[in-house]
UniProtKB/Swiss-Prot annotation:
Record keywords: Lignin biosynthesis, Metal-binding, NADP, Oxidoreductase, Zinc
Protein name listed in UniProt: Probable cinnamyl alcohol dehydrogenase 2
Role according to the record: Involved in lignin biosynthesis. Catalyzes the final step specific for the production of lignin monomers. Catalyzes the NADPH-dependent reduction of coniferaldehyde, 5-hydroxyconiferaldehyde, sinapaldehyde, 4-coumaraldehyde and caffeyl aldehyde to their respective alcohols.
Binding residues annotated for NADP(+), in chain numbering: 49, 167, 188-193, 211-216, 251, 275, 298-300
Lineage of the species this protein comes from: Eukaryota, Viridiplantae, Streptophyta, Embryophyta, Tracheophyta
Disulfide bonds: none
Reactions performed catalytically: (E)-cinnamyl alcohol + NADP(+) = (E)-cinnamaldehyde + NADPH + H(+); (E)-coniferol + NADP(+) = (E)-coniferaldehyde + NADPH + H(+); (E)-sinapyl alcohol + NADP(+) = (E)-sinapaldehyde + NADPH + H(+); (E)-4-coumaroyl alcohol + NADP(+) = (E)-4-coumaraldehyde + NADPH + H(+)
Positions bound to Zn(2+) 1: 47, 69-70, 163
Binding, Zn(2+) 2: 100, 103, 106, 114
SUPFAM superfamilies per record: GroES-like, NAD(P)-binding Rossmann-fold domains
Gene: CAD2
Keyword Aminoacyl-tRNA synthetase among record annotations: no
GO MF assignments: cinnamyl-alcohol dehydrogenase activity; coniferyl-alcohol dehydrogenase activity; zinc ion binding
Similarity section: Belongs to the zinc-containing alcohol dehydrogenase family.
Length: 357
């Protein structure tokens, strides 16, 4: 993808080690190829998986690392073969920026499951340069892994949809969890969970939020629009709710028992795992086989599904609940995220930070 054009130097906020502390970092973008677009970043959401990568919790982090995979910006340059986008258009970049394009997953519009997928950050581009994410002034991205932001969708609202939004939209479409009136449980009410409530309601489902305490009950019911709220530590209420749900989307990103939630499913019910949990999870098989229940997993979504998510949310007027912060606040935001002290997604106003000035 090389070219003779001059190199572009940009500034981002990078972690230098597993402490995860982010500070200004200047680096060179890879050269623009014929199918690349250069995106000036305007907003970038903060995801829990950013913490996982920054702190090397999976044991595969490379530093310096500029996180951020819920990127919204404007196209400033395009390669000679770019047909999808024009300079000046608002676009989004999600969790992946490359794949092999020849395997069965890629050919089946499931690029997120390609074994050679390239992560938006903490990975290596085809040309050998490291990928860096959206906590930076600009990015170079292959047009195939860029989506268009609908005109009636506020840019800051679009950012969480590029990860949290498509993470729930994709399994709902794939597993047929879109029939109005069906009962869906949302386990965990964080960034992904709150989008689960909103998108499930937009599909016409009856939504029950399941949480470990009643701290978010009023907000879940009155603000997010959930139909019911279940405290998992209330054994009596959990028993009353047994075999009442058609589906559960499990968004919890830490180790937790599965048995209490499998018991909530009807016959043929599905528990879909969405959280990245590095420890083993345990359950007893009778809870599955005596109700023909199933446990499945789902990972973000394809590029096609990501565009669908944006278009669906724009059409249905589905908004994310966000707190917009500047890059000068980003380390505090990360500390608050560890404590689950955000309703429900931080979005960084990157453009306001004037990184390259």
């Amino acid at each position: 993808m090389g070219s003779l054009e001059s190199e572009k130097t940009v500034t981002g906020y990078a972690a230098r080690d597993s402490s995860g502390h982010l500070s200004p970092y200047t680096y060179t973008l890879r050269n623009k190829g014929p199918e690349d677009v250069i995106v000036r970043v305007i907003y970038c959401g903060i995801c829990h998986s950013d913490l996982v990568q920054m702190h090397n919790e999976m044991g595969m982090s490379n530093y310096p690392m500029v996180p951020g995979h819920e990127v919204v910006g404007v196209v400033t340059e395009i390669g000679s073969e770019v047909k999808k986008f024009k300079v000046g258009e608002h676009v989004g970049v999600g969790c992946i920026v490359g794949s092999c394009r020849s395997c069965s997953n890629c050919n089946g519009s499931m690029e997120q499951y390609c074994s050679k997928r390239i992560w938006t950050y903490n990975d290596v581009n085809h040309d050998g340069t490291p990928t860096q994410g959206g906590f930076a002034s600009s990015m170079v991205v292959d047009q195939m892994f860029v989506v268009r932001i609908p005109e009636n969708l506020p840019l800051e609202q679009a950012a969480p949809l590029l990860c949290a939004g498509v993470t729930v939209y994709s399994p709902m479409k794939h597993f047929g969890m879109t029939e109005p009136g069906k009962k869906c449980g949302i386990l965990g009410l964080g960034g992904v969970g709150h989008m689960g409530v909103k998108i499930a309601k937009a599909f016409g489902l009856h939504v029950t939020v399941i949480s470990s305490s009643d701290k978010k009950k009023e907000e879940a019911l009155e603000v997010l629009g959930a139909d019911a709220y279940l405290v998992s530590k209330d054994a009596e209420k959990m028993q009353e709710a047994a075999e009442s749900l058609d589906y559960i989307m499990d968004t919890i990103p830490v180790a937790h028992p599965l048995e209490p939630y499998l018991a909530l499913l009807k016959t043929n019910g599905k528990l879909v795992m969405l959280g990245v949990v590095p420890e083993p999870l345990h359950f007893v098989t009778p809870l599955l086989i005596l109700g023909r229940r199933s446990i499945a997993g789902s990972f973000i979504g394809s590029m096609e599904e990501t565009q669908e998510t944006l278009d669906f949310c724009a059409e249905k007027k589905v908004s994310s609940m966000i707190e917009v912060v500047g890059l000068d606040y980003i380390n505090t935001a990360m500390e608050r995220l560890v404590k689950n002290d955000v309703r429900y997604r931080f979005v960084v106003d990157v453009a306001r930070s004037n990184l390259d000035k």
